[in-house]
């Protein structure tokens, strides 16, 4: 629907040009940016291949041996009888890495806007596990028929949402009294060395069309969440990467949703040589990620 709206507006603008009407070029540029970003995200998240490349780098080279997904699971404080919803589940890694820790008497609904992602998650978890169900929907329009939940999880999801406030308000509607919302993000220092690396090779490269942490990040997340939730607290995941092999880092870079694939293929050999040299003695990458833990505001209307 969003893409159809953007494309209709572009057609209307083209018609205005042909009729020699005044064109709002600022609005036009915003729409072009939105079109490029949305199509990029759609291509990136049709299935789990690109997201797996990003997760793989963290799995191989994180200094903290606990691991991101086991740590997230610990913050969830899951216990018997809980009804849980994950928004934007991706390939289901949060659950495949924690299956043995989950009690038997719980129900977990995995959701994603991408049917391809859900297929990958179902395949990874196993479609026969009665604790799990899989639903495709946009988190801006959470179906009321799903019922209410003790816990809602949004792992690195909110900064992709067009209307974060609307998503938060929808979450409050499906949380039970005393229910919790766990949403992860990162800050301005997160993976900064990777961006500096590619820009030292070609300053035109940007690994993200937007600075996602400016949309929803560690620095501004409390202000964004506070109108909808109470007792909003931030917990950092203490970690860093020491990358000692070029290929996983290159795969990570190529999987990002920026413009790198416009500039790297023609000079791939030179870029690979640069990354290989940087990783020979261990390439340090800062991680600045964590979670906001929120409780429902009972009187929100």
Q: Predicted regions span which residues?
A:
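Conserved class I S-adenosyl-L-methionine
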Residues: 2, 6, 16, 20, 24-79, 93-94, 182-204
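Conserved Class I S-adenosyl-L-methionine
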Residues: 9, 14-25, 29-32, 65, ...
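Class I SAM-dependent methyltransferase SAM/SAH-binding core
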Residues: 85-141
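A short glycine-rich, Lys/Arg-flanked "PGG" loop and its adjoining helix->strand segment in the class I
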Residues: 165-180
């Amino acid at each position: 629907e969003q893409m159809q709206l953007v494309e209709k507006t572009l057609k209307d603008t083209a018609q205005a040009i042909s009729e020699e009407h005044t064109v709002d070029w600022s609005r036009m540029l915003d729409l072009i940016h939105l079109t490029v970003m949305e199509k990029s995200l759609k291509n990136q998240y049709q299935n789990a291949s690109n997201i797996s490349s990003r997760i793989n780098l963290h799995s191989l080279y994180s200094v903290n041996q606990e691991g991101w997904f086991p740590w997230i699971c610990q913050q969830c404080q899951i216990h018997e009888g809980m009804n849980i919803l994950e928004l934007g589940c991706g390939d289901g890694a949060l659950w495949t890495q924690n299956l043995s820790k989950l009690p038997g008497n719980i129900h977990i609904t995995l959701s994603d806007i991408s049917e391809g992602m859900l297929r990958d998650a179902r395949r990874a978890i196993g479609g026969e596990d009665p604790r799990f169900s899989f639903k495709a929907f946009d988190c801006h329009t959470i179906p009321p028929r799903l019922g209410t939940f003790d816990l809602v999880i949004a792992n690195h999801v909110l900064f992709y949402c067009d209307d974060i406030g609307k998503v938060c308000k929808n979450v409050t509607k499906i949380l039970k009294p005393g229910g919790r919302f766990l949403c992860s993000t990162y800050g301005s220092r997160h993976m900064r060395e990777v961006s500096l690396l590619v820009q030292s090779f070609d300053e035109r490269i940007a690994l993200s069309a937007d600075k996602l942490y400016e949309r929803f990040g560690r620095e501004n997340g409390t202000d964004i969440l506070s109108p909808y939730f109470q007792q909003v607290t931030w917990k950092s995941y203490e970690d860093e990467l020491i990358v000692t092999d070029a290929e996983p880092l290159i795969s990570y870079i190529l999987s990002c949703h920026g413009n790198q694939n416009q500039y790297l293929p023609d000079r791939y050999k030179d870029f690979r040589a640069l990354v290989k040299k940087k990783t020979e003695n261990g390439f340090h990458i800062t991680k600045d990620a964590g979670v906001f833990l929120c409780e429902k505001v009972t009187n929100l209307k």
